[in-house]
A protein has these predicted regions:
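Metallocofactor- and cofactor-centric catalytic cores in central/energy metabolism, strongly enriched
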Residues: 1-285, 292-374
Length: 374
């Protein structure tokens, strides 16, 4: 009975108590099935993605466990880190198993190096930062018929506020922008960004067709059952996460966010692959809208789960952080919810609120493989 009566919701202060390293939120394990048996493009992409995670502002350091003979060579990773951050100075320990005298010794060394890294990481103390340092990922998954008229436009309004205040936002999932390309092209401030976006969309669409599919197959059975019967309908709602701001940059997968304002990032429509890509490009917070319910998170960027309707907020209250269903019932407007969401995002970024995905340790990490296994 005592266990059942204990509080299930932990606050940021609860989580921080009794830690050996109070300034370190935790150690996250990123495992993957890449690195070998793939084309060189995918192994290079994996190194760029890992470099993005290592240089992410939320990450204090890393211990890399390498086999030693794989396509994703350590030197490629090191070059990717140096390219992203020429002044990189975080603790970084790289161990190769094929150079170790035994697996036990290999693991022992990894633990020792990680502990030394934790000592250094704990010296970093949270300090106030301007909103211009915020990079917010804009994500959706398990969308329903309400997503495009509640959660997504509310997030879009918050995105516009962040842009106006000097921050950056990142809209991903290119297959779910099919049908609204022209609107986004018209919003590209630079002609080269408009052409890059159109070029990536054409190439992505052609590749989907070449394997016997196409963007029209993006809607899931759940999407269709709830009214999103075509990709264009789904895209019309998904694009609203980007608000009305002008597009400042267009990025291919793993490219780093370098410009404040609205960015477009090429990722697949798969929730976890896309969220993985957002953090790899530099997002330090991710807002994730859902109408049907999607229990996913990220190892390094807190994911704020937003419900599009009241029923979902009640049914899956263990994973939902922010409800926009009150827009549907007329209790709130897109503007009021967007402003409330901005305050919530700032509290999460400040460490004052711990989203459900963090509390539940939903540390999902799936790199996108564009090529084939060899």
């Amino acid at each position: 009975e005592e266990m059942m009566a204990s509080p299930l919701i932990k606050t940021a202060e609860d989580i921080k108590q009794n830690r050996t390293f109070p300034n370190v939120d935790g150690i996250k394990f990123l495992t993957h099935d890449g690195g070998c048996g793939c084309d060189r493009g995918d192994s290079d992409t994996l190194c760029n993605l890992l470099a993005g995670y290592i240089t992410n502002p939320n990450v204090a350091g890393a211990t890399i466990l390498s086999l030693g003979c794989q396509n994703a060579e350590v030197k490629i990773l090191e070059a990717a880190i140096a390219k992203r951050d020429p002044n990189f100075s975080k603790p970084l320990h790289i161990l190769e198993q094929q150079k170790s005298k035994s697996e036990r010794h290999f693991i022992e060394e990894a633990v020792k190096k990680t502990f030394l890294g934790l000592i250094e990481a704990d010296k970093v103390v949270r300090k106030p930062a301007p909103l211009s340092k915020l990079v917010l990922g804009l994500e959706c998954g398990g969308s329903d018929g309400f997503s495009g008229i509640s959660a997504n436009p509310a997030l879009g309004y918050a995105s516009d506020l962040i842009v106006a205040l000097g921050g950056a936002t990142v809209l991903s999932e290119f297959p779910e922008l099919n049908g609204v390309e022209q609107e986004l092209i018209n919003r590209c401030e630079a002609p080269e960004n408009a052409e890059k976006f159109a070029s990536i969309m054409r190439a992505y669409s052609a590749k989907a067709v070449s394997i016997g599919s196409g963007f029209e197959n993006n809607p899931s059975p759940g999407n269709i059952k709830d009214g999103l019967i075509t990709d264009a309908m789904k895209s019309a709602g998904a694009a609203k996460k980007g608000g009305t701001s002008l597009v400042q940059d267009v990025l291919d997968y793993t490219e780093r966010v370098t410009k404040n304002g609205l960015n477009l990032l090429c990722t697949p429509g798969n929730d976890v692959e896309s969220t993985t890509g957002l953090a790899g490009s530099g997002c330090n917070v991710i807002a994730f809208t859902t109408g049907l319910g999607t229990p996913t998170g990220n190892p390094v960027a807190p994911v704020i789960k937003m419900s599009s309707n009241n029923a979902l907020s009640e049914r899956m209250k263990d994973i939902i952080d922010f409800n926009t269903g009150t827009i549907i019932t007329g209790e709130d407007t897109i503007q009021t919810k967007g402003e409330e969401l901005l305050d919530y995002i700032i509290e999460v970024a400040s460490g004052n609120i711990v989203p459900a995905a963090v509390r539940l340790e939903q540390n999902d990490f799936i790199p996108w493989k564009r090529g084939i296994s060899l």
